[in-house]
Amino acid sequence: MKIKLIGNVMNYEIDAFGTLVIAVFFLFIGRYLVSKISFFRNYNLPEPVIGGLIAAITAFILYKFFNISATFDSEIQTILMLMFFTSVGLSADFTKLKEGGKSLLIFLVCVILFVVVQNAVGMSLATALGLDPLIGLIVGSVTLTGGHGTAGAWGEVLETQYGIQGAIVLGMASATFGLVIGGLVGGPVAKFLIKRNQLAETVAQETNEQQLDTSINTAPFEYPKKTRLITASNAVSTLGMFALCIFVANEMTEISQGRWFELPTFVWALGTGVIVRNFLEHVLKVDIFDRAIDVFGNASLSLYLSMALLSLQLWLLADLAGPLITILFAQTAVLILFTAIVTFRIMGKNYDAAVLVAGHCGFGMGATPTAIANIQAVTNSYGPSHKAFLIVPLCGAFFIDIVNAVVIQSIIAFFG
């Protein structure tokens, strides 16, 4: 651990192992608080989000009142993120994609509509408040649907090419807001819909997961706490597939840089996972051990979320001007109304639709890992939703980035 004085702030640089230890510590705190506080369980708040928020608030207090900050190792967080998206790809058997079929396409339509609405709200309010319309785009789908990675990439473009000063900082702050809100509103909105429409009865989590027949073909991230029996051989072969997919993803990111098919590394990881899975299974007739993929995927998901929130600099939100905070809260209200009215109705007004709403809230304001955590929290309380675990990871991790990139590029080209 290195210590540096930055201005009047003492900054501690935490290495990869220290970062992992702290992330696990706060993850367990989140798990403990959820188990002890009925409010968190009743509103289906994810354990990594609760633990990560405690960490972020602790960091905020240390920074504001004691002039102490910490810089955590970002490489291990990136690896965990790529492992999560790779697990989504490796779980995407083409037969499962066919199973998603019509529902996947309908949900994608909802997502596309919301991206357009989100940008319309952001840019309209920015104009009404006397700001550049492109600032409204930053507090629209660039950061709220796109997340921190998209915020950084487009922020640099808007600063250097379109003269939007502070676009990167604004983008990071807005993405931070979205990540927090996305993890907080999904569960409560889904609970409201379930209760109002009497869609499901609360079930005991232990009965739902531990007594489930392990032969049942479940979607990735479904039943995250179910006992999964794996061997060392299965673990090694699965780890090899993860390593291959992430290696190819990194290479494709370099090859595609500056070209028309340029995509974020995590999208390449997901896509490579889909190809590897289906090539091995349907061409080479290799048996894929899904339980090992599920274990790696769920572990990386929890740790990544904990680390992402651990690294949040909440004091950036304090620097947002009043008009921008107004836009962000308006976006939150629009998200809740859109998902509760449009997404829920279009997806069938049933239990699966309510769980899909929780997922849509997750990546509509935050990120795909938040969406998965949301639907895990809801299904832990009300029972399984195979459709949600099938649709949300694919739509949130793959299709949404392509849709968002096209929409953002079109708007910038028009207003630029």
What residue spans do the PLM features occupy?
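C-terminal ends of transmembrane helices
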Residues: 29-41, 87-99, 189, 276-290, ...
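Entry/N-cap segments of selected transmembrane alpha helices
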Residues: 93-123, 175, 239, 295, ...
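Flexible hinge motifs at transmembrane-helix junctions and intramembrane kinks/re-entrant loops
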Residues: 33-49, 61, 66, 70-73, ...
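Intrinsically disordered, low-complexity non-transmembrane regions of multi-pass membrane transporters
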Residues: 1-14, 20, 27-29, 191-236, ...
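Structural signature of hydrophobic alpha-helical transmembrane segments
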Residues: 11-25, 71-84, 134-141, 260-272, ...
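Alpha-helical membrane segments and immediately flanking helix-loop junctions
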Residues: 125-166, 170-173, 177, 189, ...
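Juxtamembrane and boundary regions of transmembrane helices in multi-pass small-molecule transporters
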Residues: 124-131, 175-219, 333, 341-351, ...
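Hydrophobic transmembrane alpha-helices of secondary-active transporters
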Residues: 26, 53-60, 74-101, 271-280, ...
